[in-house]
Amino acid sequence: MLGSLSLLWLAAMTTSLVSQPQILTLEDYQEGEEDDVTVATPSLAVRCDYDRCRHLQVSCQELQKVGPVACLCPGLSREDQQPEPPRLGEVQIMAEEGYAVVHWCAPFSPVSHYWLLLWESNGAPQKSAPLNATVRRAELKGLKPGVAYVLCVVAANDAGESNVPGAEVEGPENWTGPSFGPCRKFIMPPKPVTLVYAAVGVGTALALLSCAALVWHFCLRERWGCPRRQGMAQASEAL
């Protein structure tokens, strides 16, 4: 009997030493998952360093390829559609050198190349050679002083070319197209040297006329005498 009691006491002690099972709630389970899993924060997309008015600007699609992270490009029209007209900026005139510098911005369309159209008088315009799609600036040389011109920039791709408003007018003098668009009218002023020569010529002519008037005055005076002196002489004789 004593031995059986000892066995029961030993069994009770062994049972008490065994760890009791722990009941986990759903919240405890979720906290454990949060400790093990690292949440990745998504990186914010940035715009590509693309300026459609920048000279020698590569396409935005090329910038996406070479960038360390993906960047965003402005929306463009489809490649199977003709491009929208570019926007021609101010024309910087160099009157003394006889040329002008033009600058434009690319349209929101795929462009393979540009070219310039220059109207000087009635008839067909002068067409430049094709310009690379990265070009945004060009020089117009050989312009004549005092002449009005109409300049248009045209964008082209495989689907066609952009429209040129007002291209069918008769001469730059009658052109009344919009100033904010692909075309612009400008007038080459006379060269500063020409103005100096004209001023010198006018001054010389005035000086010669003044000298001629003085000579003519003295010649008449010597021939007919001074009217004031003749009147004084007649008055003294009468006295």
From Swiss-Prot:
Domain Fibronectin type-III: 82-179
Domain of life: Eukaryota
Pfam families the record matches: fn3
Membrane topology: Single-pass type I membrane protein
InterPro entries for this protein: FN3_dom (IPR003961), FN3_sf (IPR036116), Ig-like_fold (IPR013783)
Membrane-spanning parts: 195-215
Tagged with keyword Transmembrane: yes
Name of the molecule in the record: LRRN4 C-terminal-like protein
Organism encoding this protein: Mus musculus (Mouse)
Lineage of the organism: Eukaryota, Metazoa, Chordata, Craniata, Vertebrata
